[in-house]
Amino acid sequence: MDEFHRYGKEDSSWQQCFLYPLFFQEDLYAISHDHYLDGSSSSEPMEHLSSNDQFSFLTVKRLIGQIRQQNHSIVLFVNCDPNPLVDRKKSSYSESVLEGLTLVLEVPFSIRSKYSVEGMNEWKSFRSIHSIFPFLEDKFPHSNYVSDTRIPYSIHPEILVRTFRRWIGDAPSLHPLRSILYEYRNSSESLQRSIIVVPKVNTRFFLFLWNNYVYECESILVSLLKRSSHSRSLSHGSFPQRTHFHRKIKNIFLFSRRNSFQSIWSLKDPNIHYVRYGERSIIAIKGTHLLVKKYRYYLPIFRQCYFHLWNEPYRVCFHQLSKNCSSSLGYFLRVRMKPLLVKTKMLDELFIADLITDEFDPIVPIVPIIGLLSREKFCDISGRPISKLSWTSLTDDDILDRFDRIWRNIFHYYSGSFGRDGLYRIKYILSLSCAKTLACKHKSTIRVVRKELGPELFKKSFSKERELDSPPFSSKAAARSQRERIWHSDIPQINPLAHSWQKIQDLKIENLFDQ
């Protein structure tokens, strides 16, 4: 890859003319086969991995020969593995060819993204998903409207090919990609004309498609804003291995659908803040209600014009922070007024001023968490703990570890909220459900289980709470920690309840507008 970068600096046209011959290099598929084995070693059983030891490059040569033939170009999703032990849907040969195609297409994409990032002086490379909560705490108090929407992920295969065609001059190299996308669409159970580009399966090909799709969406949007506003404060960058972006847009011009290159009204005073995490994006706006209505109209039109995506208008919904709470990231997000006393001393006089500031106040959704726990059979719909019958076949240590992990993740995730008193109700449900599960396993009662295990029943379980909630500092530091938020860097990945709750909220919005 370093040689590609060096040659790319010397001759930019060389980057776009060498891709197609790489498809017929055997060394490329040897590398991709190793990547396939490394990626599947943790998920596939050992008998499947042993069959991959008989991987034959003669079969790969035959596949390359079929790719050369126009009538047999769609062969990548056909089982070519002679070993019947390997599942037809997980053919190592097809996966190796697919990995090889991805490696070739990643070369110009990585070069292009590297050069685009190097030219942005204002771009902060440390911005990632870990900066989402500090971003909300910093920007929400200065915004009055917020929107949390899901990025459209169903797109026609030809649109994906056109996104590659914009920056790859080697047109023949896109023919295998087009064949793969259309064959994948035809092989799916649904009869829709579009495919799902969101990486639900952790494969290199779909991760690359998703990164390129998101990069193209956001780069075109920001470039249009630059072209219209001529503002030097706008910055944009991309990281193929980081799918999370953070940028601030100060001055923008919005366009009409008929004439997208002539500004019809300009916005100088409002501020628009944008951040993306995973498959969703948050837009915080400081402006008038008219601005929000126009932006709500502009965003679906932009996606429809440039990517032929029909984005339902109800999916772009803005909430007013001063009146309503916005559900996002597993929180109820709101902004509340906070009184502030300021004392200023000038010479012998003391001035006291009472100020009112806006403060970001995330609320822990206790009732939705209890509802999700009831769906997972930890309690009933009213919050009464019940035994987890599916875990009675596990050992006592495994049961305690699983309950401990659930509580630690929940408490860790909501550690940035001031009002955490409701979390102790969640702790009560989990602790009593753990005791009932152990009692059901040993065919006894909760009293007998506590009497037999004694204080060691919950000695290990729920132990991380004291480490997080009571830092070993002085009394002043402990009192200050109660007034300050502590956002832990690993919280976006450890709470699946937040993702489940967000899906339920999206379904409620869809059902509301369908009625």
Curated annotation (Swiss-Prot):
- Chain coiled-coil ranges: none
Note whether RNA-binding occurs among the keywords: yes
Gene Ontology molecular function, alphabetical: RNA binding
Query: Does the record carry Ribosomal protein as a key word?
Result: no
* Top-level taxon in the UniProt lineage: Eukaryota
Q: Which PANTHER family match?
A: MATURASE K
In terms of HAMAP family, this protein maps to: MatK
This protein's name: Maturase K
Q: What organism does this protein naturally occur in? A: Picea mariana
Gene transcribed to yield this protein: matK
